[in-house]
Amino acid sequence: GSAGKGIITMYITCLDVEGVLVPEIWIAFAEASGIPELKKTTRDEPDYDKLMRWRLGILKEHGLGLKEIQATIEKIDPLPGAREFLDELRTFSQVILISDTFTEFAAPLMKKLGYPTLFCNSLEVADDGEITGFKMRVEQSKLTTVKALQSIGFETIASGDSYNDLGMIQASKAGFLFRSTDKIKADYPEIPAYEEYDELLTAIRNAMK
């Protein structure tokens, strides 16, 4: 039959990863490796580029290459209920995880989540396993990705917990804060905020009606 314009809407759900599905990887890594300095996040150093270079310096100082880091990350589990939430969500929506982390760090956690689609960044790794640098896929990757998906005919639904999720949340047809901070919730009272996966599932389902 002929494709009537605007009759069917195709949705894609875009989710932040850290704080939503898995713990903050660097904080969990700092605890598991016993290197407390690595707990520093973008809240302490807003310049992500600077923060990452500083982190890589600390790893080098401690002689930690990618293999050692991945072995530590393998001990980190997704947040309780995250896998079930994703499995259920993917029964009725296409889902893309969008994160500022790196494919190589996220790999052990993606395995535990059933290998969802993840858009993130890449590390530069030397033959001996030393992490020598990193490549950010694109500036403002969350907002850029949502806009790109909209340009190919998708309506997006987005959820995340932090400041760098606000762009994609505000640009989407529906957007939700999940386990966010009191400050962000107070500053953006117009964005519905949820704490539990079943609430978020219901909100996403309702947004697709």
Language model segments and positions:
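Acidic, Mg2+-coordinating phosphoryl-transfer loop and its flanking beta/alpha structural elements
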Residues: 95-100, 154-195
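Alpha-helical segments flanking ligand/cofactor-binding loops in enzyme cores
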Residues: 87, 147, 166-167
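Short, Lys/Arg-enriched N-terminal segments with co-localized hydrophobic residues
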Residues: 1-9
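Alpha-helical substrate-recognition element adjacent to the catalytic core
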Residues: 11-122, 126-127
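Short, well-ordered alpha-helical microsegments
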Residues: 103-107, 165-166, 201
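Substrate-recognition "cap/lid" segment bordering the active-site pocket of phosphatases
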Residues: 104-156, 187
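Short, acidic/turn-prone active-site loops that include or flank metal/cofactor-
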Residues: 120-125, 180-184, 198-200
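Short amphipathic alpha-helix with an adjacent loop that forms part of the alpha/beta core around
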Residues: 203-209
